[in-house]
């Protein structure tokens, strides 16, 4: 599809959603609202997910990981061809900000529901985006004009501009591949970790450096732009409540901004998008310092996780707007809308807030979302779903809306108390605590939360989760069965106890029934705080060992880096001593409680 208004633009007739979870459900429902048939795709672990069932058609991508499924260009384009879909919506994450995939979709003769590949390329490269922002006269803190070539350049920048500094993935976002250095000595390790995370998440490891604003707010502008040069800011959001630089709570409009700050954000966001020749839905992100200084952060060239709070306060369906823009239509709004009330979104992630938000994969044995006035739940799971470690940790999003911020907070307290999830740890206990925390509630002078507030100031009294069941991949063996539907050969995967039998109650050929592993309720093992063993605090993959056999360490030294749900997690020494008995190797998949090494 051409990216300019002067050419003839095809119209969407059938949408393939190249994603999973709650965003796939969200886009499928929008397609139904628009009268468009939808197509889902899925990896093997998602075969029974709600988005697969809700779509008009679903095609298996195969594979257990993102790389084998949702990141595979050929498989997704093949599913589009087989289904007859003429448009692809990427959701967010995965291939949503991949310019090469956007171009491949267009080259295949399909409609790409998103910005042009060139805009994605320019704004997705954080260094190029800074150049665009500078030309648009957006506010900016000092940073390297191009990616750095090594840790030495990072050290040189820190020595010139001072600490703290942020090392950031040049081709990513969402907190992945971002590390903050507060001392010169930690720069080499943090740079190496940022490069690893960036490579794993985005396929490219280049990083740039900029001065880090201490205790900033994260404020952003939701932009929608058509292919005729019209740009509107649908509203602002505050996303300051984060852990590991990934958002947990978002609200709209951004509270406690001056009229000048709000105007500067709206105006500069529009200038940046026009400078980049942007069309589609996008988000221009800023940091706001304690002194009120505003600094451009990045542009996310896709729909954001937190888009529902803007929908609730602006009265705009942003996914439907994406469809209309992709169809070549002009925006049906010409001015920035005035916010209607206040909305807050809470991400319901599979993480244990009582253990520093460690990823906590597991089965969802009960999912009971709240309802009532001013309550919306966007979910990608249901009772019986299994949250594995292959993908990110989000189960659902709770969105509350009120006449003002106070009413939204009151509804949030009620809805969070109603929200029931069993079987695995979630961040709901954190949300219940934060909506009553004076730092977040604020007063006439504003609130005191910032992007590092959770890690540095929040008093975490939440008990570690103990009521779940361990994830047992073998509990329900599956069998693939070939069936014909209207003459079309379809391969389906069924639980073995539901698969076809010979009519006498015997197991189907090739099905091996496994006795379920005994489950211990309440079992909970974290990283050792005493004794010699250094144990894995979570299920995940060993990325690297930072120590060698016989090496002397002191308490707090990095021992091993684990990866789970697309985030790296350091495991440190709990006491002084000598490393012995390195028990696993880099690349090994481990479970919570696995002994990684001992300190004698």
UniProtKB/Swiss-Prot annotation:
Annotated positions binding ATP: 158-219
Q: Out of the domains of life, which is the source?
A: Bacteria
Tell me the ranges covered by the ATP-grasp domain, including all copies. Answer: 130-327
Tell me which Gene3D superfamilies the record gives: 2.40.50.100, 3.40.50.20, ATP-grasp fold, A domain, ATP-grasp fold, B domain
Q: Does the keyword Oxidoreductase apply?
A: no
Instruction: List every position bearing N6-biotinyllysine.
Output: 566
Ranges of residues in domain Biotinyl-binding: 524-600
Q: Which GO terms describe its biological process?
A: carbon fixation; fatty acid biosynthetic process
Pathway given in the UniProt record:
Lipid metabolism; fatty acid biosynthesis; Lipid metabolism; mycolic acid biosynthesis
Summarize where Mg(2+) 2 binds, as residue positions.
298, 300
Q: How does it assemble?
A: Homodimer. The biotin-dependent acyl-CoA carboxylase complex is composed of AccA3, which contains the biotin carboxylase (BC) and biotin carboxyl carrier protein (BCCP) domains, and an AccD protein, which contains the carboxyl transferase (CT) domain. Can interact with AccD4, AccD5 and AccD6. The AccA3/AccD5 complex forms a dodecamer, and can associate with the epsilon subunit AccE5 (Rv3280), which stimulates carboxylation by the complex. The AccA3/AccD6 complex forms a dodecamer. Interaction of AccA3/AccD6 with the epsilon subunit AccE5 (Rv3280) decreases carboxylation by the complex.
Annotated function? Component of a biotin-dependent acyl-CoA carboxylase complex. This subunit catalyzes the ATP-dependent carboxylation of the biotin carried by the biotin carboxyl carrier (BCC) domain, resulting in the formation of carboxyl biotin. When associated with the beta5 subunit AccD5, is involved in the carboxylation of acetyl-CoA and propionyl-CoA, with a preference for propionyl-CoA. When associated with the beta6 subunit AccD6, is involved in the carboxylation of acetyl-CoA and propionyl-CoA, with a preference for acetyl-CoA.
What is the protein name stated in its UniProt record?
Biotin-dependent acyl-coenzyme A carboxylase alpha3 subunit
Record the organism.
Mycobacterium tuberculosis (strain ATCC 25618 / H37Rv)
**Gene it is expressed from:** accA3
